[in-house]
Amino acid sequence: MNRIALVFLYSLFLFNLAIGRVESQTCQCIQPDPSMLNCLGYDSKLQADTIDEAIASFPDLSLNDDVANQKFSTADVGCVTKECQDCRKDMRKQLQKVGLLAKDINDIVASQVDSNSTCTKYGFTRQQQKKSHDDDDDDDDSDSDESKEEEEKKKRDRKHRRDKRQAITQGSQNNTDPNLIGTRFTISCAMKGVSVDPTGTVSLCSSCWVWRQLPSNYRPQYINELVCDNTDSDCLSGYATCSVGHRTFEAIRNDNGVQTQVTLTAGSYCECRISKSSSLQSLVEGTGISGTYNPLSNHTTPV
C-alpha cells in the first residue's frame, strides 16, 4: 500500500473518530442483552440512564434558547469551566429541593441556589440571579410607595402560585394523569407573558420543566419533559385553555428477566388552544373578530 493510501486511511480514521465523539454527546445506547449486538439508541438531551447523565446533558426545555444550549453541549465537554461546575452544583441543589435527589448526610451545601453562581443555563438560576440583583436595587431605590405596593402584590401572587405548585409537586404529581408511568418532578416553571425567547416574544401558556423518573425496571430511567403548568391552565384571559403536546420515545422494560422494547409518551410543549365554539375562532382563521367575548366557564374540547 503506497504512502498516499495510508495517509487517506489515517485521515478517514481520524474523521470517523471525531464524528463518533460528537455523536456520543447526544446519542447514547442501551444494550438490553449483552450477548446480542443490537442496542436501543436514545437522545441524551431527552433521556438519561443515570441521574449524573441527566445533570450533565439535560437542557432546560422551558427556555427557547438554542444558542445557549448549543454552547453548553459542545464548548465544555469535560465540565472544567466555573460556569459548567456552577450549573451542575445548582442543579444538584434543585434536585434535592424537589425530592428527586436525596441529600447525603455529609452534604454541607446549602439548599438554595447560590446567588453568586455564574450559571445561565437554567431558568431557575437566572431567576435567582435577577432576584438578587433586584434586591440590591431595592436598597437604593427611591420609587413611590404606590410602585412598591404594586411590586409587592406581584411578588405575593407569584409566591402563592409557587406555593400551590410546590404543594402539588410534594404530593402526588401524577394525579392529573393516572395513566402516566413513573413520577414527575418539577424543576422550574415559566409564567405566561414572560419573555423566554431571544426574539422578545412571550408565551401564551405557563409551562413547567419536569424530569420524570420511570420505575426501576425501565431503562433509560430519566425523561426530560415540558408540560403545562397545572396550577395555571387558562390562556388569553380565560378565552382559551392550555394543552400539552406529546412526543413518543422508546424504552426497555424488564419483566422478571424478559426484556421488552416499549413505546411511551412524554410532554414536549404547551400550547394555547381555543374552543371550537369560541368567538375567537374567526380571529384564528384570519377572518377578523366576531361576536362577544365570553370567557370559558368550563374546559371544553379545544381545536
From Swiss-Prot:
Glycans are attached at N116. It comes from the Eukaryota. Residues 167-178 have a biased composition (Polar residues). The keyword Ribonucleoprotein does not apply. Keywords: Glycoprotein, Signal. Residues 124-179 are annotated as: Disordered. SUPFAM superfamilies: Cystine-knot cytokines (SSF57501). Residues 1-24 form the signal peptide. Disulfide bonds: none annotated. The keyword Signal applies. PANTHER family: PROTEIN CBG09882 (PTHR33995:SF4), PROTEIN CBG18546 (PTHR33995). This is Uncharacterized protein T16H12.9.
